[in-house]
Amino acid sequence: MKTLGTTLLLLVGLCLPVISQTNRVNAQSSPSFTVRRVLLLSIDGLHAVDLAIFVRSHPNSALAQLSSSGITYTEASTSKPSNSFPGLLSIVTGGSPISTGVWYEGAYARSLSPPGSNCKTVGTEVIWSNSLDRDKKVLDAGGGIDPAKLPLDPSKGCVPVYPHSFLRVNTIFEVAHSAGMRTGWIDKHPSYEMVSGPSGMGVDDLFTPEIGSATRDVKGQEAYDDVKVQAILNEIEGQDHAGKVSVGVPALFGMAFQVFRFAQVTPTGGYTDASGTPSAPLLDAIEHTDQSIGKMVRALKARGLFDSTLIIITAKHAQAPIDRSKRRIIDDTIIPNLVNRVKGGLVALSYADGNITSIWLTDQSQAGKVAETLSQPSNQSAAGIQKVLWGESLKLMTNDPIQDIRVPDIVVIPNLGDIYAPAGDTILAAHGGFSEEDTHVALLVSSPGFSQRMIKTPVQTTQIAPTILKALGLNPRTLQAVEKENTTSLPGLFEGAEPGAKTSQAAPGAGTASLGADSRSSRR
């Protein structure tokens, strides 16, 4: 089948400390190679510093080898909030909650009705977790999502709202699928079918083995990740994820690793110092993940696919705190109790999760009084509050909650190290918040034709989505979030790089990689 590919063009022998728009590629005089597929990997929890430390200390690792022919973006930031759902959606839609309408894994929907209510009431918590599974203790989730647990939409005949239909904008998988390309994605439980996009058709081969079936230790989580890695290896062989049907290698596919995230938070894991030195369990987790990536690279090479595959490694979110001496568990009932003191029954939903608390009010006119109460010094101290976002301060970063019914009325940001969780919780770290340690994630874009470089200009993970489409020869502006938020591709990859992008000094003989005009080619 003839499909659109993209030729990546190399400028050899340039030492460029700074890239500007004037550094354009002469397509006719540069050697070229073709991107025919993109492998997208999220190592959940991976900070930029984690990647840097590992590559430096493991020069023969798969990640080191990929970085030796890749561009490392050292100042990449994931979504705010830095929860798994907005984090992943930023990568696959090119947009923030401003466009996606997905604030967090758990939120309040003022226009939907509770499960099983027959739409007799309106307003309900929506939570896209494994609580929606038929059985969250078995690998296949007991057959997937239980429709009886889904919120209902009274405006559409009281039908259940599946995760994909909650999303407001399309995804890279939908765009690629519509262009006739095969797509695949693998994640940790069935609610991640959201990545298929509003059509529900974006991912041809979706595999969501339930993470709740894995034992709660590093080895158990590694074994769980191994199931997903084998599915990727099957897809590289041109089969479906189960290895049963010959369907061809996807043009866009990938997975999310979980063991590193688990090893960061388990009481025996985490870091040994504030600089990010991994504990033995955390080191074991990243070494295992690296070995898995190595298996993928070897499989691509064995099939002659490696040279035409763009590999992107990033993270949906990071975790905080790195310095375990700063860790303090804050009882997650404190904040809703303070809010309800302002007015009885004022809390529609207080979703306290790790490094953030999001509050939806039954009476939105009370937001100012609630913020004032939470900002009192004694309450700030008891609840570990660093900042309360509401009104104009909230509207500067997201949609107005009066206009967008999915946005919380108040967002509480805790002090670095303070974690909202049930009293007595033993986790060492969490995510979801706005801090540097929550959001500063790894980002590596690798292809055999690249020379090793670092770009230190701040970038967002939203820029991955248009980058992927452009690399596949597709129009990034077909992504609705990209169009709405004017998201650009990552700098340094394409002809006409972003102005003013800073890069480290290249080694002698190193060059820049840039994308020329689309070219037609047969996909292997």
Region roles according to the model:
Residues 189-212, 239-288, 295, 325-328:
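Active-site His/acidic residue clusters
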Residues 288-330, 391, 468:
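Metal-dependent active-site segment of extracytoplasmic phospho-/sulfohydrolases and closely related
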Residues 93-105, 200-241, 275-291, 331-352:
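Acidic, His- and aromatic-enriched active-site or binding-groove loops in soluble protein domains
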